[in-house]
């Protein structure tokens, strides 16, 4: 799959005249088209609902776009709940899935009428102790343990994950919730991250559908929905094939028809909590080349760093890089593409073949629309970059300004720092 930026050099030059690099840029047209494609893939399920994983891109302007496409919010913290409330999401348009949950988070989620997803059976008792109200619809998170395999390949290791409950704990939690007057129940699980295998969702769905039938019979509860959570990934590398969400939706339907329908449970809704799939390809980090260095290797240094995009430094993750204006030139130079942090892992690419790069060139680092800005930080006194939205009509809107030194010092009460520009 060829990786092409959704923005041109001329567009970036115009943006940079008003909003200096580095900045994260999002493509409204791509976001909307992808949201509609996801909904089409699950249109066979009348009550299908996507809850965007706010942690992936916590910006209310992005959430507003998704809300207008009928998409809710998957929240895991108090501040994410506040953001969802601010954009007008309430009630069953919010899923609250957290772990090690503070009392105030549970209370806020209940106040908003969100669907609360309990990560552990002990949290049901904790919820009662803090005096939070039990709602008609509540959910529990399942962890089957062991290894999660697909086509004899280990995709992830739920046995090592801190999330979710065992099957027996699910039964105990459902029994407790039923005693508290809960009438409708949901089952949730997340068993693998960033999968590009078409079989992930269908296999997960089958596991959860079978559990739903078992819990419905043994505990005597109404299973209202199965939440497949996230885990559907994207093709970060040009040689990867992107996920076919239409094929995934069809395969989930096949499992639904084979497991739930014969059990008389054809009213079960399908929920998803996609973050990366929804946003990553429709965001990029735009940066400018500041310096080049030639010692034992050839380096190009950008005005962006790992504080703007942590994934390569933290995970060794691949992000494709395009040198704007040189898309058709041969990639015959090998570079390490770096930022300016005092850390040797502050590298966006290592031994990457690219066109000859010159100081002043603009580069696009692809697929940063999820877990890009949101994982930013202030190490080395670096400041978080702006976020811009390329609107459908071609205009650009700043949806978050860049931080200033004054922002960095805002929580310090120390003479001489408050007024730094």
Task: Show which residues each predicted segment covers.
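Conserved, mostly hydrophobic/aromatic
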Residues: 31, 55, 77, 109, ...
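Active-site loop/helix belt of alpha/beta enzymes
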Residues: 144-290
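A charged N-terminal "starter" segment
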Residues: 1-136, 171, 177-179, 183, ...
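Charged (often Lys/Glu-rich) extended helix/loop segments that serve as interaction or gating elements
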Residues: 260, 265-421
């Amino acid at each position: 799959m060829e990786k092409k930026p959704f923005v041109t050099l001329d567009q970036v030059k115009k943006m940079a005249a008003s909003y200096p690099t580095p900045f994260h840029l999002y493509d409204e047209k791509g976001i909307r088209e992808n949201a509609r494609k996801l909904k089409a893939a699950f249109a066979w399920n009348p009550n299908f609902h996507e809850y965007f994983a706010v942690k992936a891109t916590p910006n209310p302007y992005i959430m507003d776009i998704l809300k207008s496409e009928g998409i809710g919010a998957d929240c895991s913290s108090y501040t994410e709940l506040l953001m969802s409330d601010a954009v007008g999401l309430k009630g069953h348009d919010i899923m609250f899935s957290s772990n090690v949950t503070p009392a105030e988070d549970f209370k806020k989620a209940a106040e908003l009428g969100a669907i609360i997803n309990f990560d552990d059976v002990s949290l049901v008792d904790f919820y009662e102790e803090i005096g939070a109200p039990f709602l008609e619809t509540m959910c529990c998170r399942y962890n089957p343990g062991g290894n999660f395999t697909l086509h004899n390949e280990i995709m992830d290791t739920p046995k090592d994950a801190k999330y979710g409950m065992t099957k027996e704990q699910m039964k105990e939690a459902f029994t407790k919730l039923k005693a508290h007057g809960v009438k409708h129940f949901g089952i949730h699980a997340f068993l693998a991250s960033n999968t590009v295998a078409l079989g992930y969702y269908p296999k997960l769905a089958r596991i959860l559908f079978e559990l739903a039938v078992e819990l419905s019979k043994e505990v005597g509860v109404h299973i209202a929905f199965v939440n497949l959570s996230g885990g559907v990934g994207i093709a970060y590398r040009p040689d990867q094939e992107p996920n076919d969400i239409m094929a995934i939706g069809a395969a989930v339907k096949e499992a639904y028809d084979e497991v739930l329908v014969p059990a008389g449970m054809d009213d079960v809704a399908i929920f998803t909590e996609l973050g990366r799939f929804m946003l990553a390809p429709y965001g990029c980090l735009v940066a400018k080349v500041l310096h080049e260095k030639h010692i034992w290797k050839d380096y190009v240094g950008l005005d962006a760093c790992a504080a703007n995009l942590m994934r390569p430094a933290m995970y060794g993750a691949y992000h494709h890089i395009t040198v704007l204006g040189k898309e058709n030139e041969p990639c015959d130079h090998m570079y390490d593409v770096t930022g300016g942090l005092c850390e040797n892992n502050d590298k966006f690419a290592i031994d990457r073949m690219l066109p000859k790069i010159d100081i002043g060139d603009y580069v696009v680092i692809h697929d940063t629309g999820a877990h890009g800005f949101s994982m930013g930080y202030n190490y080395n006194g670096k400041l978080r970059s702006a976020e811009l939205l390329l609107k459908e009509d071609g205009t650009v809107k700043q949806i978050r300004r860049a931080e200033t030194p004054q922002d960095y010092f805002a929580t310090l009460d120390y003479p001489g720092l408050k007024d730094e520009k």
